[in-house]
Amino acid sequence: MECVKQLCRNHLRLDNLTDPVRSVLTKGTTAEKVQLAACCLGVVCSIICLALGIAAAAVGVSCGGFALGLGIIAILLGIVLFATSALDVLENHGLVGCPFKLPCKSSPANEPAVQFFKGKNGSADQVILVTQ
Protein backbone atom coordinates (compact mmCIF):
# COMPACT_ATOMS: atom_id res chain seq x y z
CA MET A 1 0.00 0.00 0.00
CA GLU A 2 2.88 2.34 0.75
CA CYS A 3 4.17 1.72 -2.77
CA VAL A 4 0.85 2.86 -4.26
CA LYS A 5 0.83 6.00 -2.10
CA GLN A 6 4.38 6.85 -3.14
CA LEU A 7 3.51 6.27 -6.79
CA CYS A 8 0.52 8.60 -6.50
CA ARG A 9 2.62 11.27 -4.80
CA ASN A 10 5.29 11.09 -7.48
CA HIS A 11 3.17 10.82 -10.62
CA LEU A 12 -0.33 12.14 -9.93
CA ARG A 13 0.51 15.75 -9.10
CA LEU A 14 -1.01 18.67 -10.97
CA ASP A 15 2.45 20.18 -11.47
CA ASN A 16 3.37 17.19 -13.62
CA LEU A 17 0.77 18.40 -16.15
CA THR A 18 0.95 22.17 -15.74
CA ASP A 19 4.75 22.44 -15.96
CA PRO A 20 4.99 20.85 -19.45
CA VAL A 21 2.07 22.98 -20.68
CA ARG A 22 3.78 26.10 -19.35
CA SER A 23 7.01 24.96 -20.99
CA VAL A 24 5.29 24.54 -24.36
CA LEU A 25 3.70 27.97 -24.09
CA THR A 26 6.93 29.73 -23.11
CA LYS A 27 9.68 27.77 -24.87
CA GLY A 28 7.85 25.75 -27.50
CA THR A 29 8.02 26.34 -31.20
CA THR A 30 5.08 27.83 -33.06
CA ALA A 31 4.29 24.43 -34.58
CA GLU A 32 4.13 22.83 -31.11
CA LYS A 33 1.85 25.59 -29.83
CA VAL A 34 -0.47 25.21 -32.81
CA GLN A 35 -0.49 21.42 -32.44
CA LEU A 36 -1.31 21.64 -28.73
CA ALA A 37 -4.11 24.16 -29.32
CA ALA A 38 -5.56 22.09 -32.16
CA CYS A 39 -5.41 18.94 -30.03
CA CYS A 40 -7.20 20.58 -27.13
CA LEU A 41 -9.83 21.99 -29.48
CA GLY A 42 -10.20 18.59 -31.15
CA VAL A 43 -10.71 16.78 -27.85
CA VAL A 44 -13.33 19.33 -26.72
CA CYS A 45 -15.19 19.15 -30.06
CA SER A 46 -15.09 15.36 -30.03
CA ILE A 47 -16.53 15.25 -26.51
CA ILE A 48 -19.28 17.69 -27.52
CA CYS A 49 -20.10 15.58 -30.59
CA LEU A 50 -20.18 12.46 -28.45
CA ALA A 51 -22.57 14.10 -25.99
CA LEU A 52 -24.80 15.35 -28.82
CA GLY A 53 -24.82 11.91 -30.42
CA ILE A 54 -25.83 10.24 -27.17
CA ALA A 55 -28.50 12.89 -26.57
CA ALA A 56 -29.88 12.45 -30.08
CA ALA A 57 -30.04 8.70 -29.59
CA ALA A 58 -31.80 9.17 -26.26
CA VAL A 59 -34.39 11.48 -27.79
CA GLY A 60 -35.09 8.93 -30.48
CA VAL A 61 -33.94 10.63 -33.63
CA SER A 62 -34.32 8.25 -36.53
CA CYS A 63 -30.83 6.87 -36.63
CA GLY A 64 -29.97 3.24 -37.08
CA GLY A 65 -28.14 1.53 -34.26
CA PHE A 66 -25.31 0.50 -36.55
CA ALA A 67 -24.76 4.05 -37.80
CA LEU A 68 -24.91 5.39 -34.26
CA GLY A 69 -22.39 2.80 -33.09
CA LEU A 70 -20.02 3.67 -35.92
CA GLY A 71 -20.39 7.37 -35.13
CA ILE A 72 -19.59 6.84 -31.46
CA ILE A 73 -16.58 4.68 -32.32
CA ALA A 74 -15.31 7.33 -34.74
CA ILE A 75 -15.71 10.08 -32.15
CA LEU A 76 -13.98 8.05 -29.44
CA LEU A 77 -11.16 7.31 -31.87
CA GLY A 78 -10.90 11.05 -32.54
CA ILE A 79 -10.62 11.75 -28.81
CA VAL A 80 -7.86 9.16 -28.46
CA LEU A 81 -5.94 10.44 -31.48
CA PHE A 82 -6.15 14.09 -30.42
CA ALA A 83 -5.16 13.21 -26.85
CA THR A 84 -2.16 11.12 -27.91
CA SER A 85 -1.01 13.90 -30.22
CA ALA A 86 -1.20 16.39 -27.35
CA LEU A 87 0.68 14.00 -25.06
CA ASP A 88 3.35 13.62 -27.73
CA VAL A 89 3.99 17.38 -27.65
CA LEU A 90 3.92 17.50 -23.86
CA GLU A 91 6.34 14.57 -23.46
CA ASN A 92 8.94 16.57 -25.38
CA HIS A 93 8.62 19.24 -22.68
CA GLY A 94 8.96 17.01 -19.64
CA LEU A 95 5.61 15.29 -19.22
CA VAL A 96 6.20 11.92 -17.61
CA GLY A 97 4.02 9.26 -19.13
CA CYS A 98 2.59 6.22 -17.45
CA PRO A 99 5.17 4.74 -15.06
CA PHE A 100 4.15 1.23 -16.12
CA LYS A 101 5.19 1.51 -19.77
CA LEU A 102 6.14 -1.72 -21.39
CA PRO A 103 9.33 -1.63 -23.40
CA CYS A 104 8.32 -0.84 -26.95
CA LYS A 105 11.72 -1.13 -28.53
CA SER A 106 13.30 -4.50 -28.86
CA SER A 107 16.99 -4.78 -28.26
CA PRO A 108 19.00 -4.44 -31.43
CA ALA A 109 20.16 -7.63 -33.04
CA ASN A 110 23.80 -8.45 -32.63
CA GLU A 111 25.22 -7.98 -36.08
CA PRO A 112 28.63 -9.34 -36.88
CA ALA A 113 31.35 -6.85 -37.70
CA VAL A 114 34.40 -7.47 -39.83
CA GLN A 115 37.75 -6.06 -38.78
CA PHE A 116 40.69 -5.91 -41.15
CA PHE A 117 44.24 -5.82 -39.86
CA LYS A 118 46.83 -4.62 -42.36
CA GLY A 119 50.12 -6.31 -42.81
CA LYS A 120 53.47 -4.66 -43.31
CA ASN A 121 53.05 -3.96 -47.03
CA GLY A 122 49.44 -2.63 -46.74
CA SER A 123 47.65 -5.81 -47.79
CA ALA A 124 45.02 -7.44 -45.61
CA ASP A 125 47.04 -9.59 -43.29
CA GLN A 126 44.24 -10.87 -41.11
CA VAL A 127 40.44 -10.67 -41.19
CA ILE A 128 38.47 -11.25 -37.99
CA LEU A 129 34.70 -11.65 -37.75
CA VAL A 130 33.54 -10.13 -34.46
CA THR A 131 30.11 -10.77 -32.95
CA GLN A 132 28.92 -8.66 -30.07
Swiss-Prot record:
Recorded GO CC terms: extracellular region; host cell membrane; pathogen-containing vacuole membrane
Membrane spanning residue stretches: 41-61, 66-86
Induction: Cotranscribed with incD, incF and incG within 2 hours after internalization.
Cell location: Secreted; Host vacuole, Host pathogen-containing vacuole, Host pathogen-containing vacuole membrane
Membrane protein topology class: Multi-pass membrane protein
Segment forming the signal sequence: none
InterPro entries: IncE
Cross-referenced Pfam families: IncE (PF17627)
Keywords: Host membrane, Membrane, Secreted, Transmembrane, Transmembrane helix, Virulence
Keyword Cell inner membrane (UniProt): no
Task performed by this protein: Inclusion membrane protein probably involved in early modification events of the chlamydial inclusion.
Protein name (record): Inclusion membrane protein E
